[in-house]
């Protein structure tokens, strides 16, 4: 701590640092500051108490905007902030408890075991090694199955803190370990991914892993109460079992069915699903057999943007002709067509929901529908699909090269007084 002295002076009551460590921090050799790496829930709640925004304050090291938003989202899940980010009465009550907001919420809403669990989660792990199972820590505090390698000093502090926290706690809320853990960490309810390895996705959207040898490795649902901080896929250091029924009962207001139509790049088709979700967790997933055609068409547009236009022969000829037209004519460049798909394509996509469907799709009617009658007449005059010889024979014009061309015998143009032109360019005769 530092005490104020005369203007420009600061008297330290603690350790005095030389400049070398600060040079080390600037060089990146020291651990990041707490505001860079720590949990920002308490900080975000304090901001809300004062009705302040982080941008209003000056920091030596400002908080990361994304991590601050995550903390505010957690506080909203805890009921400490409302939907506008303002502090609630429950949030104000949490600030009066000598605990992290997560744990304060658990003690306020949980049963008789909540103070003990809060004390365990506030202290360094009393068990050295072994399973991550939080139930083993509760047993050790209660004097049941205490392993030889227990940290007795930490255990003693946990017991003292638990007694202190229990004073004034009503304890009339849920008391199941998994539910208590989920009350504190609603963003860390973890659902096991498919596959043999114990890899999990958490309700907040991040990934987590568990040692394959841990007794909890086969559990479908866990609550991760301590993680190693890896930003890509954190390793669980403490966790509690959570039953499906307890999750549904305790968080019924946050679990709901969602309908979605999305383009699957991996499968090359539109997926229409009904999913029961808790945060990022998909608890149940079913086919949406009666998905509206409009929803499927909108999802297919993402597939079209990935695959490209894929025009057939007739559509490719039309596009080549249209792209020869000058200013004032509708834009038929591929970039423009893909950017404006919503304006011209959805109504033509009935029955199209996969890569194979799109390859077989006749694009020409959708393209020509973009033209007015006058535009169509102008196109036929300036860049016709066929050239009519003096003998009355119609010959298809090839627009695939840089210059339009036709293949015919020279005798067939006898009687023509001037060279045929296409959109201002000479028609090449081969």
State where each predicted segment sits.
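Second RecA-like catalytic domain
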Residues: 4, 16-339, 343-359
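Arginine/glycine-rich "motif VI" loop of SF2 helicases in the C-terminal RecA-like domain
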Residues: 6-11
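Short hydrophobic alpha-helical segments that form membrane-spanning helices or hydrophobic packing faces
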Residues: 12, 95, 212, 397-401
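A structure-centric signal for secondary-structure junctions around beta-strands
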Residues: 12-13, 426
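C-terminal structured domains
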Residues: 358-361, 365, 369-430
